[in-house]
Each structure stands twice: as C-alpha cells, then as structure tokens.
Amino acid sequence: STILFADNGLNLYGNAVLVNEAFAEENPEAVKGFLRALVKGFSDAVADPAAGVAAVLARNETLNSDIELERLGMANAMNIKTPYVIENGFGDVDMDRLAASIETLKVSMGLTGAVAAADVFDAQYLAPAAERMLP
C-alpha cells in the first residue's frame, strides 16, 4: 500500500526543472530544446515502460528490471500521467496549486519573504500544450 502526500493534504509538486534566469534569457532555444527533449523522454516512457526501464538499466546495471518496471508503472499512474497532465499537457503547473505549495513550504520550513508562483515558474519556454500531451 502506498501513502501519497497529496491524499493527506500535502499537494506539493514533486519534480521541477530549474534554470538560471540569466542562462534562460541568453539561451532560450537551449532551454526550449531541453524541455522538448524531456517531454519526449517522458512520453516515450509512458508509451513503452519496458523500453524506458531498459534505457535506465543501460546506465545502471545494478537495478532490477522487474522492480524498476513496477516503480515506473506506479510513477506513471500516480505522478506523471495525472488528470491535470492529461488535460493540460506535461510540464505546465496549476498556478493556484503552486502558490499554495509555496505557502506550505514557507510555514513548514520557516521561510520568510513574499514569493509568488510567477516568481518561480515561467511557461514561456514550454512548447504548446498540444505538443506536450502524453500518450
């Protein structure tokens, strides 16, 4: 049985791509290209989990393919191909959810200062939603 934070009131984002603002401004096509490649990799792993696991095993032979396939299946079902992603495409965020996450982190980690969701997420580098839909 799996206990999910989101099922228990902690609806935080679990993964993010971070980029230095100066780098992004100076190299927008590199950032866009990286994000397109990331979406392609996730799309491929959702479409063919066994091939996704094989790609990981090629880089880390100590892993167990059966366990990794089970783990990827769980991740795809619970964290990657979510209802929000199905509707909006991979890589975008719900700004209200992100704002609430920031507030939760401020309280739990004792952070101070005003941080808006728009301060930490910029969708301008994402491909159009139609190009970010998972299979």
Task: Give residue ranges: language-model regions.
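Ligand-binding "clamshell"
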Residues: 1-6, 68-70
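Residue-level signal for pocket-adjacent positions within structured domains
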Residues: 12, 18, 85-88, 106, ...
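Short, catalytically relevant binding-site loops at active-site mouths
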Residues: 9-10, 23-24, 41
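Secondary-structure end/capping motifs
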Residues: 26-110
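Small-molecule pocket liners
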Residues: 1, 13-17, 21-22
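Conserved C-terminal helix/tail region of periplasmic/extracytoplasmic solute-binding proteins
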Residues: 98-135
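Helix N-cap / beta->alpha transition motif
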Residues: 4, 20, 94, 122-126
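Short Pro/Gly-enriched coil loops immediately N-terminal to beta-strands
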Residues: 5-13
